[in-house]
Amino acid sequence: LGPTGYGDSPYQALSAFAGNPLLVDLDQLVTDGWLTAGDLAGRPTFNEDRVDFGLAIAWKLGQLDAAWERFQRVATDWQQGEFSEWCDAHAAWLPDYALFMAIKEDRGGQPWVAWPSELRDRDPAALQEAGERLADLAGAHRFRQWLFFTQWGRLKAFAAGKGVRLIGDAPIFVAHDSSDVWARRDLFQLEDDGRPSCVAGVPPDYFSKTGQLWGNPLYDWEVLATDGYAWWADRLKACLELVDIVRLDHFRGFEAYWEVPADATTAETGRWVKGPGAEFFTAMREALNGRLPLIAEDLGVITPAVEQLRDDFDLPGMKVLQFAWSGPDNLFLPHHHVPNGIVYSGTHDNDPTLGWWRHLADAATREMVAEYTAGAVEEPHWTMIRLGM
């Protein structure tokens, strides 16, 4: 749900706390009075099969700018107060995010490490000058967040009224070019100029002989531990404002993570470094009032130590049906599932089930699925749903 930058990937969000304003429903803004029907009359004809991100983003942000302009003109004192109260309630992250986005926009989208050193290094006088000069632009970004959180809150309440709980996904690492890293450089392993001293990835495996070089900055877990991992506690609380359960992506990184030199071109030269482990989850459980509404994404290089960490905190792991068809001993097959587990047909890395069946599943896989389900597989997506139930 986070705001995306270059590449449009939710795994490279511009903030771990903010919402994506591109998800704001413009028709609802007409209902709320921040746009008019005439504003939407010039809606472009979008391709219904493929997303043209450039066209969609430019048009939608233009409409959000129009809504901000109208809000400033017509909002009542009560509405202005409601907006201000919401901003105050999110003061732990919103001012930094809004200023970060305003400066980035003012500088043509430059990453923060390319900004003048006084802005890059958050010189107080430079930040004050930028805040005053870009006040309207920063206000627009605060307004977009208010719209997102207001609409998402309605959606979440509607789902709750129907007995539906929402599951969200939290990447373990954040993007280097994010307000989080810019505002809290002390929490990450960075050089004096703000660039990473080492980056995240995973080692070589069957699927990639050079591993995966993700490039995210790594946490300085020793610094995070000094205040009981408060930044992470705030992050999970923010996630749980939006969803009911959080899937922790790359759970194994909390036990040990793959550290790669920042100048490496592949992940081959990395090494395993111990993560915060049980101390971290103990702190999170305390911060979340004794609860851990989390799912452990326990895929990849999973060791007994990772499994022990997951089980010690009673976190459900994942069972992915598309990965199940290598033989009868495969632990993803339904008869091996355990009560404390979440069944997925596939993950965000997989083709949707129908596409997988049509284009990726080989003859042996299809035969095994048919044998396992004792019949012809005419609708593989429904077959997978039944297996997961």
Regions found by a protein language model. Name each.
Residues 165-230, 235-238, 242, 257-273:
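Substrate-binding/active-site clefts of carbohydrate-active enzymes
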Residues 99, 165-168, 245-250, 295-298, ...:
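A structural signal for short, well-ordered beta-strand segments and their strand-loop junctions
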Residues 45-55, 132-147, 210-230, 265-274, ...:
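The substrate-binding groove and active-site-proximal loops of carbohydrate-active enzymes
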Residues 2-3, 170-178, 213, 252-254, ...:
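Active-site-proximal loop/turn and secondary-structure-junction residues that shape catalytic pockets
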Residues 9-36, 181-206, 270-281, 315-325:
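Acidic, His- and aromatic-enriched active-site or binding-groove loops in soluble protein domains
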Residues 1-185:
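Acidic/aromatic-lined carbohydrate-recognition and catalytic surfaces
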Residues 141, 148-161, 225-315:
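Active-site neighborhood of glycoside hydrolase catalytic domains
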